[in-house]
C-alpha cells in the first residue's frame, strides 16, 4: 500500500541479482595521485534491461518501496544465487507501518512486503539487485535497481553487538600480531595485500567475514618491521554494472605512503611517533565557549611569502609553525598577547587534490625551467630566460590585464596549492604539508606543528569535511564507494546518482556506518593529536543527531572541545526533507556554533554570488549603505535597506538571539526571530555559543576587496582603512564568538578574486612583513570572475589610487585590530554566557523611526541589580559611527563614562577625540568607540 492510502490489488515483485562479463577500463586522466589497481573478473552475462533506474528502496528485511505508477501492476521478486532461481508473488504491505522507518523523502512511495530469510537477504545483497515490473496483458516492462543503505543498517547495525559497536576498524597492532578489520557486507571476497617499506609484497591474506556484522577480518604476524597494506575486494559495483576486483586503501587509515597509494600500519600511542615533549605540552584551557576567538589560517598561506624563515625547506609546511623568528611567528605572538586564543587550520587531513611528491609540483619560487620539465608544452617554455622564477616573470607583467591570471590558471594542476576541501582519507594528516610525507614522518611533523601552536599559547582547531569525498565510484581517489558501493554516499531517490550539492560526491552521514566513521575519526584527532575543536564544512548536510553524538564522543576525551560549522540550508537535504539537519535554526540551544550570515550581510552587503554592477549596488552598513551611497545606489531604496540591515545588525550584536527584544525601524517592539532575513528569521540562536560572528573568511572576496567594489570612488585611503576596521569591530564586539580571517588585519586582498581555493600563492599571498596587502596584482582568474573584469577596471581607474595602501596604513590597521581584540578580552561583558544575561543586560539606543542614520549604539550593563560579571566595570557603551561626519549621541549620565583606556592609549588619534559629556557622547566619523563606567 501507499503509506497514506491502502490499495487492494494484488502485486508481485521481482528482485534480480546478476553479474556481467566485460573488461573494465577506468579514467586515467587525473594525475594528482598515484592510482590504485582496478581490474574486473569474468562472470555470467545477463540480457540487457529495457530500462533502468534506482527508484526501488529496500528499507528492512520485510519492507521495500517503489514509486507509485498505475501502469505497473505486476512485480516479481527474483534472485540468482549461483544459478539457483527463486520467485515469489507478493502483495502490497497492509500491516501497521512504523512511519519512522520511512525516510521523509520516500513517504509517497508504495510499500511492499518481502518474504525472505535474513541469511538469504545477506547473500542477495552481494549481487546486483533490481525490481522488474510489468503491466498485465502487455509486453511493457520496467526495471529499477534497488537502493539498500537503510537495509544494510538494519541488518548489520541494529543489534547491541554488531558492526557499529566495533572499536578497532583498520589495522590494530599488538605485541605478536597486526589485526585488520573492514566493514564490507556486500563484498564477495576481501583479501589483505601486505607490503614492506619498499612496497614489495610480503603477505596475501584472505580475510574472513562475520555474517552477523559484515566485517571482514584477519591478521599477520607483527615482525616489528614497517607494514604497508591495501585491500583487494571482489564486489559488484553499480558504477560499471559489473563484478569488479578493486584494490583500495583503508577508510580507517591512520597513516599512509606518499600520495596515499598504500595504507600504513601505525600505533599512534607509540613514543617513536611523537615529537619530543609531546606529553608535556600545555593545552590552552577555555572556561566558556564565548571566550574563544578563532583566527582562520591556511597552512601554506602562513609561510609561503615569509622572507624570515630559517630555511626554504619549511616554506608552506607544518614545520613553519615551529620557527622561532619568522615574520609569521612574531605576528602570532602579538596576536596571542592581544587575546586571540585559537588558530583555526583550513583542512589538514589527507586530500585528493595535492601531489605529495615535491619533485612533481611547482611553486612561484621555482625557475621556469622546472615548469618546463613537468609541462614541456607550456607557453612559458618559449621565453629565453628559463632561470628566472615564475614569481619574477609574473612581476614583469602589467597589473590591469588578464595576463597574470592566465599564467596562474595554467599552472593550477601542477602547483602545490589547494584549500583542501577534497577528502581522500579522513584521519591522516595531509602529506603535501610535510617535508617527508611517507608513513609516520608526516604524523610526527603534524604533531610538532600542533605542539608548537599550543606552546605559543593557542588552541588548535581543525577544519573538517565529512559532508563529501573528493571522488566516488571507481575513480582514483574514491575509497568508501569502492568498499560498500552506494552506501556511504547520498543518492537521488529516483536516479540513484550521487548528490553533489556540496560541490562533490556527498556523503550520507544519516547512515549508521558513515556517522560512525565521522565520530571515530573526530575522536582520533582529539585524543591522539590533541586537537581542541572542529569546524564542520557544510554541516547542515549532516543530521543534527549525528553532530550531537559526535560532540558527546569527543567531549569524553576532551571536555572543553568546541564544535562549529556552516549551517546553510540548501541542496537535497534542505528544509529537513531527509532528516533534521544540523542547520542554523535546528542547532539553536545546542552550543554547536553556526556561522551567521545575518550580521555578515548587514555589514558587507548581501549578494555574495552576484556579478558586475549588481555587486556594486549591494552596499552594506560597513561599505557605505545610506551613509556613503555610490553612483549606482538609489538613496530612497538605500535608506529603506539600511533600516532593515541596522535591525539585523543589532540582533547580530546580541548573539543573533531569537528572543532578543528590540524596537524595530517601524517603532514596533519585536524579537530577533520576528525581524526578517529573506524568508528566514534574523534571530535564531538560543545561546551565545550558537553564534559565530564574521565579516570575512576564506570564502568569497576578502573584506578589503568587498569594500572596494562598493565604496564611492572619491573615498580617501584613510577612510577606506577606517571603514575596513570598523567592519571588523562589529564581529569582534558582538556577543557570541568572533571568527577572523588571517590577514584581514593587514587589509588583505586577493585582487578581487571571489574563490581562491586553487589559485596558488599569487592571489592568496599574506605578507606578515606588512609591506603589501596584495591588492591590484592582476585581474582575478577568468574562470571565477571574468564577468567582473569591466567593473574591476572601472573601480581601479576611478579610485585614482585612493584604494592603494602603504606599509604605514597596514601597520596602523594591524595595531588597531589588536586593540579591538584586547578590548574584547578585557571584560567578560563582551562574552556573556547565556541568553538571559544578554536579554537583560544588552540594550540598543537610537532605534525606531527617529533613529539617526549611521549610528549603532549598544550598552551592556553590569549594575548591582544583576549578578556581577566584571569586578571593575559596571557598564559599557559601544558606539559605531558609520557616517562620514562626527556624531553627538544623547545618553543619560554619559559623563560617568570614559573612553576605554586601551583606546585612550592606542595608535588611533581619531578615536581619542571621542568624548563623554553630561548627557551625550561625541564620536568622530567612521569610528567605533568603547566607553566604560567603572564599578
Predicted regions and their residues:
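Active-site-proximal helices and loops of the catalytic beta/alpha 8
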Residues: 205-209, 362-365, 382, 538-684, ...
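Loop/helix patches that line or flank the sugar-binding groove of alpha-linked glycan CAZymes
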Residues: 675-877, 883-890
Amino acid at each position: 500500500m501507499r503509506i497514506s492510502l491502502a490499495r487492494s490489488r494484488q502485486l508481485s515483485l521481482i528482485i534480480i541479482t546478476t553479474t556481467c562479463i566485460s573488461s573494465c577500463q577506468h579514467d586515467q586522466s587525473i594525475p594528482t595521485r598515484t592510482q590504485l589497481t582496478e581490474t574486473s573478473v569474468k562472470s555470467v552475462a545477463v540480457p540487457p534491461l529495457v530500462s533502468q533506474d534506482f527508484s526501488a528502496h529496500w528499507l528492512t528485511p520485510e519492507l521495500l518501496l517503489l514509486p507509485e505508477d498505475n501502469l505497473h501492476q505486476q512485480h516479481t521478486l527474483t534472485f540468482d544465487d549461483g544459478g539457483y532461481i527463486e520467485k515469489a508473488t507478493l502483495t502490497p504491505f497492509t500491516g501497521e507501518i512504523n512511519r519512522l522507518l520511512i525516510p521523509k523523502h520516500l513517504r509517497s512511495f508504495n510499500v511492499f512486503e518481502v518474504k525472505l530469510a535474513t541469511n538469504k537477504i545477506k547473500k542477495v545483497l552481494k549481487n546486483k539487485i533490481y525490481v522488474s515490473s510489468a503491466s498485465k496483458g502487455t509486453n511493457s516492462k520496467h526495471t529499477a535497481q534497488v537502493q539498500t543503505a537503510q537495509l544494510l543498517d538494519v541488518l548489520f547495525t541494529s543489534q547491541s553487538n554488531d558492526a557499529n559497536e566495533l572499536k578497532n576498524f583498520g589495522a590494530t597492532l599488538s605485541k605478536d600480531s597486526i589485526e585488520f578489520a573492514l566493514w564490507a557486507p556486500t563484498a564477495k571476497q576481501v583479501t589483505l595485500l601486505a607490503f614492506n617499506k619498499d612496497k614489495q609484497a610480503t603477505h596475501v591474506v584472505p580475510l574472513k567475514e562475520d555474517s552477523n556484522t559484515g566485517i571482514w577480518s584477519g591478521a599477520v604476524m607483527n615482525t616489528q618491521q614497517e607494514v604497508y597494506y591495501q585491500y583487494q575486494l571482489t564486489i559488484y559495483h553499480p558504477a560499471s554494472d559489473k563484478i569488479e576486483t578493486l584494490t583500495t586503501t583503508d577508510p580507517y587509515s591512520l597513516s599512509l605512503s606518499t600520495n596515499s597509494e598504500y595504507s600504513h600500519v601505525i600505533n599512534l600511542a607509540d613514543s617513536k611517533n611523537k615529537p619530543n615533549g609531546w606529553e608535556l605540552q600545555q593545552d590552552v584551557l577555555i572556561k566558556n565557549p564565548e571566550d574563544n576567538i578563532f583566527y582562520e589560517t591556511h597552512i601554506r598561506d602562513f609561510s609561503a611569502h615569509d622572507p624570515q624563515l630559517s630555511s626554504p625547506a619549511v616554506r608552506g609546511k607544518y614545520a613553519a609553525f615551529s620557527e622561532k623568528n619568522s615574520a609569521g611567528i612574531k605576528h602570532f605572538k602579538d596576536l596571542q598577547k592581544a587575546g586571540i586564543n585559537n588558530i583555526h587550520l583550513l583542512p589538514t587531513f589527507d586530500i585528493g587534490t595535492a601531489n605529495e611528491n615535491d619533485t612533481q609540483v611547482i611553486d612561484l619560487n621555482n625557475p621556469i625551467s622546472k615548469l618546463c620539465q613537468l609541462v614541456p608544452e607550456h607557453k612559458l617554455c618559449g621565453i629565453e630566460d628559463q632561470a628566472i622564477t615564475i614569481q619574477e616573470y609574473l612581476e614583469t607583467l602589467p597589473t590591469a590585464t588578464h595576463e597574470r591570471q592566465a599564467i596562474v590558471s595554467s599552472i593550477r594542476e601542477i602547483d602545490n596549492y589547494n584549500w583542501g576541501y577534497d577528502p581522500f582519507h579522513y584521519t591522516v594528516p595531509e602529506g603535501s604539508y610535510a617535508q617527508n610525507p611517507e608513513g609516520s614522518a608526516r604524523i610526527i611533523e603534524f604533531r610538532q606543528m600542533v605542539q608548537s601552536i599550543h606552546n605559543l599559547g593557542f588552541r588548535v582547531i581543525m577544519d573538517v569535511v565529512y559532508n563529501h569525498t573528493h571522488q566516488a565510484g571507481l575513480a582514483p581517489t574514491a575509497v568508501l564507494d569502492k568498499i560498500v558501493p552506494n552506501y556511504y554516499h547520498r543518492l537521488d531517490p529516483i536516479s540513484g546518482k550521487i548528490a553533489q550539492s556540496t560541490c562533490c560526491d556527498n556523503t550520507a552521514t544519516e547512515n549508521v556506518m558513515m556517522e560512525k566513521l565521522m565520530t571515530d575519526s573526530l575522536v582520533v584527532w582529539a585524543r591522539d593529536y590533541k586537537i581542541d575543536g572542529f569546524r564542520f564544512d557544510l554541516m547542515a548536510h549532516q543530521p543534527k543527531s549525528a553532530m550531537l553524538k559526535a560532540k558527546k564522543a569527543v567531549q569524553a576525551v576532551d571536555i572543553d572541545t568546541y564544535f562549529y560549522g556552516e549551517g546553510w540550508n540548501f541542496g537535497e537535504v534542505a528544509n529537513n526533507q531527509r532528516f533534521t539537519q544540523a542547520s542554523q535554526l535546528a542547532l539553536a540551544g545546542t552550543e554547536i556554533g553556526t556561522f551567521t550570515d545575518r550580521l555578515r550581510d548587514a555589514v558587507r552587503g548581501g549578494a555574495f554570488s552576484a556579478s558586475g554592477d549588481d555587486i556594486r549596488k549591494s552596499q552594506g552598513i560597513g561599505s557605505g549603505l545610506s551613509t556613503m551611497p555610490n553612483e549606482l545606489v538609489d538613496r530612497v531604496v538605500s535608506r529603506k535597506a539600511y533600516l532593515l540591515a541596522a535591525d539585523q545588525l543589532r540582533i547580530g550584536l546580541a548573539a543573533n538571539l531569537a528572543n532578543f527584544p528590540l524596537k524595530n525601524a517601524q517603532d514596533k517592539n519585536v524579537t530577533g526571530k520576528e525581524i526578517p532575513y529573506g524568508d528566514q528569521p534574523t534571530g535564531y540562536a538560543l545561546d551565545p555559543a550558537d553564534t559565530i560572528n564574521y565579516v570575512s573568511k576564506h570564502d568569497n572576496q576578502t573584506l578589503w576587496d568587498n569594500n572596494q567594489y562598493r565604496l564611492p570612488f572619491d573615498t580617501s585611503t584613510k577612510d577606506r582603512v577606517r571603514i575596513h576596521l570598523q567592519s571588523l569591530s562589529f564581529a569582534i564586539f558582538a556577543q557570541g564568538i568572533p571568527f577572523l580571517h588571517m590577514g584581514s588585519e593587514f587589509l588583505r586582498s586577493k585582487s578581487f578574486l571571489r574563490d581562491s581555493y586553487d589559485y596558488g600563492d599569487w592571489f592568496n599571498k599574506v605578507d606578515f612583513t606588512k609591506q603589501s596587502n596584495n591588492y591590484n596584482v592582476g585581474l582575478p582568474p577568468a574562470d571565477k570572475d571574468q564577468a567582473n573584469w569591466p567593473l574591476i577596471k572601472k573601480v581601479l581607474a576611478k579610485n585614482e589610487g585612493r584604494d592603494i595602501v602603504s606599509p604605514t596604513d597596514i601597520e596602523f590597521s594591524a595595531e588597531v585590530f589588536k586593540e579591538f581584540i584586547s578590548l574584547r578580552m578585557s571584560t567578560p561583558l563582551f562574552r556573556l554566557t547565556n541568553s538571559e544575561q544578554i536579554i537583560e543586560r544588552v540594550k540598543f539606543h537610537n532605534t525606531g523611526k527617529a533613529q539617526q542614520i549611521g549610528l549603532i549604539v549598544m550598552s551592556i550593563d553590569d549594575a548591582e541589580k544583576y549578578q556581577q560579571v566584571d569586578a571593575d566595570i559596571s557598564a559599557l557603551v559601544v558606539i559605531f559611527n558609520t557616517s562620514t561626519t562626527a556624531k553627538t549621541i544623547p545618553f543619560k549620565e554619559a559623563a560617568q563614562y570614559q573612553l576605554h583606556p586601551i583606546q585612550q592609549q592606542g595608535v588611533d588619534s581619531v578615536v581619542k577625540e571621542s568624548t563623554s559629556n553630561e548627557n551625550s557622547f561625541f564620536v568622530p566619523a567612521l569610528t567605533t568607540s568603547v566607553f566604560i563606567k567603572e564599578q
